[in-house]
From Swiss-Prot:
GO molecular function: RNA binding; structural constituent of ribosome
Organism, scientific name: Candida glabrata (strain ATCC 2001 / BCRC 20586 / JCM 3761 / NBRC 0622 / NRRL Y-65 / CBS 138) (Yeast)
Pfam families per the UniProt record, alphabetical: Ribosomal_L1
UniProt entry tagged with the keyword Transferase: no
Annotated CDD domains: Ribosomal_L1 (cd00403)
Cellular component, GO, one term: large ribosomal subunit
Protein name as catalogued: Large ribosomal subunit protein uL1
Superkingdom of this protein's organism: Eukaryota
Keywords: Ribonucleoprotein, Ribosomal protein
GO terms for biological process, alphabetical: ribosome biogenesis; translation
Length: 217
């Protein structure tokens, strides 16, 4: 049983979009984030959950992605307008932690050719996994553009040591219905991951990058 109503979410989405439309135009696309505060959860003792959800509409169309590819996928990446690195490029990093950290910070997500994915831990160590950015595999038969869109549309709820999470659920260019739907889908999915469902939810807030927070719960 959901504790938030569609109409309540819609009211807040209206306010959020109104604020964004009426304030100074930003020179970037503002992301709309769902910020979650948990309660009655002990990250030390309770199972730390992790789950991914593919949203119907991509929340961050300009999310930066890099492809670790063989020659075939490096070529395909260029035609998709996505950055790519070959095995030689990865070897040049020489397992240098600073350089790998810089790479991990530069991109929001990574995709790797299936043939390379097993080499990633050997070439780059555990850094990408620790940052929650281990590459998504892609095969030569997959549509690479579709895979990039999938990665951009997938959000991840992962409990670490602190009891708050934030995920991108949309952007301020979306229409009201789309944004409401994406928020409700994300909330329901998150609640399904929690041990005691709604009893573990302390607060739910939506916020655009530069706008104020609107409380849903």
């Amino acid at each position: 049983m959901s504790k938030i109503t569609t109409s309540h979410v819609r009211e807040n989405v209206k306010e959020l979009l109104k604020y964004s439309a009426e304030t100074k135009k930003r020179n970037f696309l503002e992301t709309v984030e769902l910020q979650v505060g948990l309660k009655n959860y002990d990250p030390q003792r309770d199972k730390r959950f992790s789950g991914t959800l593919k949203l119907p509409v991509c929340p961050r169309p300009n999310m930066s992605i890099c492809i670790f590819g063989d020659a075939f996928d490096v070529d395909r990446a260029k035609s998709c307008g996505v950055d790519a690195m070959s095995v030689d490029d990865l070897k040049k990093l020489n397992k240098n932690k600073k350089l790998i950290k810089k790479l991990s910070k530069k991109y929001n997500a990574f995709i790797a050719s299936e043939v390379l994915i097993k080499q990633v831990p050997r070439l780059l160590g555990p850094q990408l996994s620790k940052a929650g950015k281990f590459p998504t595999p892609v095969s030569h038969n997959d549509d690479l553009y579709g895979k990039v869109t999938d990665v951009r549309s997938t959000i991840k709820f992962q409990l670490k040591k602190v009891l708050c999470l934030a995920v991108a659920v949309g952007n301020v260019e979306m229409d009201e219905d789309t944004l409401v739907n994406q928020i409700l889908m994300s909330v329901n999915f998150l609640v399904s991951l929690l041990k005691k469902n709604w009893q573990n939810v302390g607060s739910l807030v939506i916020k655009s990058t530069m706008g104020p927070a609107f409380r849903l719960y």
